[in-house]
Amino acid sequence: MPDHGMSRLLVAAFYAFTPLDDDQREALLSALPTQASHGAVLGSVLVAKEGVNGTISGPEQGVEGLLEHLQEQLKLGEQHFERLEVKRSWAERSVFRRFKARRKKEIVTMGVTGVDPRANVGTYVDPEDWNGLVDDPDTLVIDTRNHYETAIGSFDGAIDPGTDSFRDFPHWAETKLRPLIDETAPKRIAMFCTGGIRCEKASSYLQHQGFGEVHHLRGGILKYLEQVPEEESRWRGECFVFDQRVALNHQLEPGEHSLCHACGLPLSPEQRSLPSYIKGVQCLHCIDRFSESDRQRFAMRQRQMDQLSSASSKKSDDFSL
């Protein structure tokens, strides 16, 4: 775990599946921005009938204060199905530009009614027990994340569904996974995602649809990277995150990937060195996707961003004098 001195900011990814009525949701949506402002916390929190899901960053005291506020308001306990699941990491600077609390139909969008992890969910697997499970040849390991996430890192031998969004998972499960299970007859399924929320909902779906014995990694990849030593790890590559860090390495520090600001996909240093890459304008993934007028507009935007960055750096240098 990296040193988190006074200059570092705490980043917390969290979720809880807990039923919220209209009054509870409105109370949270009203109180969270005030709580965040008092603690200098930035980020995003989704509030729905099924619970809360968010990632926030800021001074440690402010972030922990907001998490405590959520724990109290939601009246959560310590059972798997009712706790506020939190993954913590650190950053040198803010990874968000603002704070938003938003009302949503689902805290992670699958688009299937009747899926409730509180009522029906797979077996939770702690990070220290994950290696033994996935090393078993009778275990079918599934990465429930999107294709652009799996492209930069995953567990050894995991199946990549190749989805564009989590909404695609049920269709993939019915059209690809079910025939695969019929053919190979694995003893169990083991699933994982970034922080645990998607695989928890996916395992609930598979259980409900009769896919057999289903397990999922508690706390997701982030908790695994936090608790399992790198020399014992089955993880390969970097873990995509939905904030300005883009990806994290095994030490939960910002990795080497950055986003193409034209298409939004992550790029490795090698991909950024290709002739097809023009910063802010195009990359190997989108070179044929946009029109010439689009690329001119992207180039103008990049020049403006570079000018703002240069001006900001000059102000910092002047202040340091």
Curated annotation (Swiss-Prot):
E.C. numbers: 1.14.-.-
Top EC class of this enzyme: oxidoreductase
Pfam families for the chain: Rhodanese, UPF0176_N
Reactions performed catalytically: uridine(34) in tRNA + AH2 + O2 = 5-hydroxyuridine(34) in tRNA + A + H2O
Biological process per Gene Ontology, one example term: tRNA modification
Keyword terms, alphabetized: Oxidoreductase, tRNA processing
Segments crossing the lipid bilayer: none
Domain Rhodanese per the UniProt entry, residue ranges: 135-233
Cited function: Catalyzes oxygen-dependent 5-hydroxyuridine (ho5U) modification at position 34 in tRNAs.
Entries under PANTHER family matching the protein: RHODANESE-LIKE DOMAIN-CONTAINING PROTEIN 7-RELATED, THIOSULFATE SULFURTRANSFERASE/RHODANESE-LIKE DOMAIN-CONTAINING PROTEIN 2
Family (UniProt): Belongs to the TrhO family.
Record protein name field: tRNA uridine(34) hydroxylase
Annotated organism of origin: Parasynechococcus marenigrum (strain WH8102)
